């Protein structure tokens, strides 16, 4: 497991969750 993947996921996941939950 790479720290780079973790950092990218930390940036991408909130945007995906925001789009799904419509809580921006």
Curated annotation (Swiss-Prot):
Q: Where on the tree of life does the source sit, at the highest rank? A: Eukaryota
Q: In which tissues is it expressed?
A: Expressed by the skin glands.
Q: Please report the name of this protein according to its UniProt entry.
A: Brevinin-1Pe
GO CC annotations, alphabetized: extracellular region
Location in the cell reads: Secreted
* Keyword list, A-Z: Amphibian defense peptide, Antibiotic, Antimicrobial, Disulfide bond, Fungicide, Secreted
* InterPro entries noted in UniProt: Antimicrobial_frog_1
This chain's function reads: Antibacterial activity against Gram-positive bacterium S.aureus and Gram-negative bacterium E.coli. Has activity against C.albicans.
Cystine pairings recorded for this chain? 18-24
Q: Which family does it belong to?
A: Belongs to the frog skin active peptide (FSAP) family. Brevinin subfamily.
Q: What is its main location?
A: secreted
GO biological process, alphabetically ordered: defense response to bacterium; defense response to fungus; killing of cells of another organism
The protein's organism comes out as Lithobates pipiens (Northern leopard frog)
UniProt keyword Kinase present: no
Q: Does the keyword Glycosyltransferase apply?
A: no
Do you know which Pfam families this protein is assigned to? Answer: Antimicrobial_1 (PF08018)
């Amino acid at each position: 497991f790479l720290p780079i993947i973790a950092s990218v996921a930390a940036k991408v996941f909130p945007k995906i969750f925001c789009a799904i939950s419509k809580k921006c």
